[in-house]
């Protein structure tokens, strides 16, 4: 028995020492954004175009993935890390001439999610002019997805979700075609997706979720209708997403996740309540989810990094005013420099206006 006990104590001691070593690493990491590693991480994703199963399994997200990578690079002031011409060529190769939208990958059906990402990649690369004649078709494709009740479907198959509505409204804004949208009908639908707790769900009557809150608040922001929601109740719901460790979760009783640094923060920023959150603790949480060896940011510390969490971690840090990053526009999740150039930027915070 004694031998067993000693072994248990020995193992426990080793684990504690390991944890302490880990802790020192985390403390070091938790103070700086490892820009160089993250840039390399994104560049390597681009080079992984091989026959690996993982690559093909994520083909339906490829356009989104490229946007996440390109936007993160621009926010880290490393836009030149990927070849501009190759990016533009890839985006245009995903255009679906049949429907007028963009697919996630060449010869995939058009979808509103990949259509917005395609437009954003071109905007990030100052290449929207490359759309040429396609521009009108894209606007028609986006408008064709709106239903009678004001909601939007993602493609011709008909599933609706407030994410699709946000993508549609943002895409139209980027293409300067908001005047063609029935704004009031769209706003009415968004308001019907709000809940008594102040949050928003993916459709009427659905549970409040932070990602859907952003899509609704972001769309209302573009449509200049933020005065039509109960901002205080919403802000309280958003602030309650911060867990004791500093991170944010998407709804009550769930684990914290780096991507909510964006969904929650951008929403708070749009209703001018960013200061309601403990920014230092959140910043430490995001930085502690970095992979110091391979680069990239994970959903939470010790997990595997991916481009999605890298983008939203970096964007969250930008909203928190992290030094050395481009300022991000909370409405579009694009650098202010880009939305200003397109004249679609709606300045919320005085500090952004001062830049």
Name what the model sees in each region.
Residues 215, 219-336, 343-344:
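Structured C-terminal portions of repeat-based eukaryotic scaffold domains
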Residues 28, 32-35, 56-66, 81, ...:
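Alpha-solenoid helical-repeat scaffolds
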Residues 348-353:
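Conserved small/polar residues in nucleotide/adenosyl-binding loops
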Residues 2-114:
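Internal amphipathic alpha-helical repeat/solenoid segments
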Residues 62-73, 111-123, 161-172, 209-221, ...:
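Well-ordered alpha-helical segments within folded domains of soluble proteins
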Residues 75-85, 124-136, 174-187, 222-235, ...:
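Structural helix-adjacent loops and short alpha-helical linkers that scaffold large soluble proteins
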Residues 93-171, 184:
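Extended ligand-binding groove/face enriched in aromatic
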Residues 38-57, 93-108, 142-159, 190-211, ...:
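Glycine- and aromatic-rich loop/turn segments at beta-sheet edges
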């Amino acid at each position: 028995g004694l031998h067993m006990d000693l072994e248990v104590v020995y193992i426990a001691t080793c684990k504690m020492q390991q944890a302490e070593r880990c802790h020192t690493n985390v403390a070091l990491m938790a103070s700086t954004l490892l820009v160089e590693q993250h840039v390399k991480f994104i560049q390597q994703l681009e080079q992984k175009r091989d026959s690996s199963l993982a690559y093909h399994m994520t083909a339906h997200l490829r356009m989104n993935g490229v946007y996440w990578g390109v936007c993160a690079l621009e926010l880290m002031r490393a836009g030149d890390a990927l070849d501009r011409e190759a990016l533009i060529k890839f985006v245009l190769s995903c255009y679906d001439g049949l429907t007028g939208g963009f697919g996630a990958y060449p010869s995939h059906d058009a979808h509103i999610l990949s259509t917005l990402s395609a437009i954003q990649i071109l905007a990030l690369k100052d290449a929207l002019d490359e759309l040429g004649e396609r521009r009108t078709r894209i606007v028609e494709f986006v408008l064709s997805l709106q239903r009678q009740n004001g909601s939007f479907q993602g493609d011709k198959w008909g599933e609706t979700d407030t994410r699709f509505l946000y993508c549609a409204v943002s895409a139209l804004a980027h293409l300067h075609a908001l005047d063609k949208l029935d704004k009031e009908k769209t706003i009415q639908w968004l308001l019907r997706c709000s809940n008594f707790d102040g949050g928003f769900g993916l459709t009427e009557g659905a549970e409040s979720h932070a990602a859907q809150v952003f899509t609704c608040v972001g769309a209302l922001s573009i449509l200049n209708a933020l005065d039509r929601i109960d901002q205080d109740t919403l802000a309280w719901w958003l602030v309650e997403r911060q867990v004791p460790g500093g991170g944010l979760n998407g709804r009550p009783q769930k684990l914290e996740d780096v991507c909510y640094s964006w969904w929650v923060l951008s929403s708070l920023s749009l209703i001018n309540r960013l200061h309601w959150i403990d920014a230092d603790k959140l910043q430490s949480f995001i930085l502690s989810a970095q992979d110091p060896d391979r680069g990239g940011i994970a959903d939470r510390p010790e997990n595997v990094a991916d481009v999605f969490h890298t983008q939203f971690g970096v964007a969250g840090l930008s909203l928190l005013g992290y030094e050395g990053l481009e300022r991000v526009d909370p409405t579009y999740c694009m650098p202010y420099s880009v939305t200003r150039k397109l004249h679609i930027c709606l300045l919320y915070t005085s500090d952004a206006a001062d830049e």
